[in-house]
Curated annotation (Swiss-Prot):
Gene (UniProt): ugtp-1
Compartments in which it is found: Membrane; Cytoplasmic granule membrane
Residues passing through the membrane, by range: 40-60, 177-197, 211-231, 282-302, 309-329, 330-350
Protein name as annotated: UDP-galactose translocator 1
Membrane topology: Multi-pass membrane protein
Bias (Basic and acidic residues) ranges: 9-30
PANTHER family for this protein: NUCLEOTIDE-SUGAR TRANSMEMBRANE TRANSPORTER
Annotated InterPro entries: Nuc_sug_transpt (IPR007271)
Pfam family, one: Nuc_sug_transp
Similarity section: Belongs to the nucleotide-sugar transporter family. SLC35A subfamily.
Alphabetically ordered keywords of this record: Membrane, Sugar transport, Transmembrane, Transmembrane helix, Transport
Natural source organism: Caenorhabditis elegans
GO MF annotations, alphabetized: CMP-N-acetylneuraminate transmembrane transporter activity
């Protein structure tokens, strides 16, 4: 099946499948410990996140590498659309959680959302960080091949560990520090693969700038680690604010921050139009980015960052394999294979420690 055959008409149906069923979430809450959801629920979330991240990485890479620069869409407008989509979905999910009772819905929204500016301000921190991360993702994927992007972004495990020590007072065992070190070596091997690729295939023409791409990925890792730990702390602080209200607060700030980001591209947007260059595949990016953001909050609430790392590890393998089928100019050498193995082993070792 060719990648070009993806149609936006299927995206709404896929979106319904990707979102967690309320009964699944209720089962997680009703378990003896909300921090220990069922095995089936864990598998569902991990499998869904793996699919979303793989599809998102490949789709955005395809849209940025196959379109004429003069017809390129605005990445800031895509992020804004995704933030609006997240906000709409969270309102719909909370309305469903209120059993479609308009009175209860309005009372809860008024109490926890409209009349709680202090809580809204708290959630603005990870919201702005995630918005920045999403825009950096476009820069990274536009200048790196999909496989390299997926592997290097695993540095967020390092930044996450740092922020968990800084904000949550966590201490890591020797085994986990070994995993972090192994991860760093894995990334180094992947970078060596780029050097090998350029030497082995000097005729390959590419507009990809690896320095810009790697810089964007490093910045993404820092913002992702910070936002993830902060958001997890907010969702697990024992407060009375409902889960979907927390998401409303964050994504409301996300819409604001994404709108501000659009101002940096204002001249282009005003000249060509907000939706210039949008195709069915670009709308697929919007939906995947929107639903993927919701799954991040779901993982932070019912699981933790370690399960997110598992999904990333599987996604790395899928992206590398599928990239070879979709992008004919992708070079996969022994350095890349070795680096990928190191990263996967590092993530597995990191997650093997029980706390």
């Amino acid at each position: 099946m060719k990648f070009q055959n993806v149609h936006i008409s299927h995206q709404d149906e896929d979106k319904e499948k990707l979102l967690p069923n309320d009964k699944d979430v209720e089962k997680a809450d009703e378990s003896p410990s909300s921090s220990r959801p069922s095995f089936v629920f864990k598998c569902y979330v991990i499998a869904s996140m793996t699919f979303i991240w793989t599809a998102y990485t490949l789709t955005i890479k395809y849209t940025r590498s196959t379109v004429n620069p003069d017809m390129m869409y605005s990445s800031t407008s895509v992020v804004l659309c995704a933030e609006i989509l997240k906000l709409v979905i969270t309102f719909a999910m909370f309305y469903k959680e209120c059993n479609f009772d308009s009175r209860q819905f309005s009372e809860q929204v008024s109490k926890y959302y409209i009349n709680a500016p202090r809580e809204l301000a708290k959630m603005s921190v990870p919201s702005f960080a995630y918005a920045l991360q999403n825009n950096l993702d476009f820069v990274g994927l536009s200048n790196l091949d999909a496989g390299l992007y997926q592997v290097t972004t695993q540095l967020k495990v390092v930044s996450t560990a740092f922020f968990m020590m800084l904000f949550l007072g966590r201490k890591f065992s020797t085994r986990r520090w070994m995993a972090i070190t192994l991860l760093m070596f894995g990334v180094a091997f992947v970078q060596m693969n780029n050097v090998s690729a350029s030497e082995a295939n000097t005729k390959r023409e590419t507009a990809e700038n690896y320095i810009v791409g790697l810089s964007a990925v490093l910045a993404t890792c820092v913002t992702a680690g910070f936002a993830g730990v902060y958001f997890e702390k907010m969702l697990k602080d024992g407060g009375s604010t409902p889960f979907w209200i927390r998401n409303m607060q964050m994504y409301s700030c996300g819409v604001i921050s994404a709108s501000i980001a659009c101002l940096t591209d204002f001249s282009r947007i005003s000249d060509k139009g907000f939706f210039f260059g949008y195709t069915d595949k670009v709308w697929a990016v919007v939906i995947l980015l929107g639903v993927g953001g919701l799954y991040i909050s779901l993982v932070m609430r019912y699981l933790d960052n370690l399960y997110k790392s598992m999904a990333s590890a599987v996604s790395i393998i899928l992206v590398v394999v599928l990239s070879m089928l979709i992008f004919p100019d992708i070079f996969i050498g022994m350095y890349f294979v070795l680096g990928t193995i190191c990263v996967v082993l590092a993530v597995l070792l990191y997650n093997s420690v029980n706390e």
